[in-house]
């Protein structure tokens, strides 16, 4: 009863001396008119956050294409931070499970985190449903997860490649939640050069060695023209019985092979 009686008493905000305002409670207004020169003490609204003062450039070249023997996945291995080459041995093909691969383009931390989270979700799906997740479902799962963070600064452009009941599957997913199915994709700063090679040499009926050579040549051409791509060409092949790592070729060796020049 004592507490109730205290709470029922009105606060003396209009009494002289309260808050040191001499009884003028109207001075508590913190709107634009409360201060001179149109200033305000009100907190800013929750608008679109400002762009960061330092913009870090991302550069890479990744590609994937479907053909009658599966899916070919290839990527360079150079990591850059602006004009600085941070590493020449980055693994840009992420192994989700024995039948699924993902590629890394954009922010390395974003791609690595979300695709490893996807690997966990795919494993949970497999345990619950007693079967492997399809390529389409895995790509949709990733798109739904990153869409919740749209506009919050994520930087990711990935390809989900695999083999399921329907055969080889290939999807492009980015940090905006976009998801596209296709036969050929290339992502990264060197993708324009890789597309030029793939568009000329791609066919669904390629033989295995022809497909390997096309992927190596496309990544090599991108590293030759794009300063943000380089290192080695890591090549994977997704087959009906799972993916295999085919090779890792230094671009200097490929330069001798494809350009015909000598050191």
Swiss-Prot record:
It comes from the Eukaryota. It is found in: Cytoplasm; Nucleus. It is an enzyme of class 3 (hydrolase). PANTHER family: METALLOPROTEASE TLDD, PROTEASOME SUBUNIT BETA. Component of the 20S core proteasome complex involved in the proteolytic degradation of most intracellular proteins. This complex plays numerous essential roles within the cell by associating with different regulatory particles. Associated with two 19S regulatory particles, forms the 26S proteasome and thus participates in the ATP-dependent degradation of ubiquitinated proteins. This is Proteasome subunit beta type-5. Changing residue 109 to V: Displays high resistance to the bortezomib, a proteasome inhibitor of the chymotrypsin-like activity. Changing residue 108 to V: Displays high resistance to the bortezomib, a proteasome inhibitor of the chymotrypsin-like activity. Belongs to the peptidase T1B family. CDD domains: proteasome_beta_type_5. Bortezomib binds at residue 108. Gene3D superfamilies: Glutamine Phosphoribosylpyrophosphate, subunit 1, domain 1. The 26S proteasome consists of a 20S proteasome core and two 19S regulatory subunits. The 20S proteasome core is a barrel-shaped complex made of 28 subunits that are arranged in four stacked rings. The two outer rings are each formed by seven alpha subunits, and the two inner rings are formed by seven beta subunits. The proteolytic activity is exerted by three beta-subunits PSMB5, PSMB6 and PSMB7. Directly interacts with POMP. Interacts with ABCB1 and TAP1. (Microbial infection) Interacts with HIV-1 TAT protein. GO terms for cellular component: centrosome; cytoplasm; cytosol; extracellular exosome; nucleoplasm; nucleus; proteasome complex; proteasome core complex. Its main location: cytoplasm. PROSITE patterns: PROTEASOME_BETA_1, PROTEASOME_BETA_2. Induction: Down-regulated by IFNG/IFN-gamma (at protein level). Induced in breast cancer tissue. Up-regulated by sulforaphane in breast cancer cells. GO terms for biological process: proteasome assembly; proteasome-mediated ubiquitin-dependent protein catabolic process; proteolysis; response to oxidative stress. The active site is at residue 60.
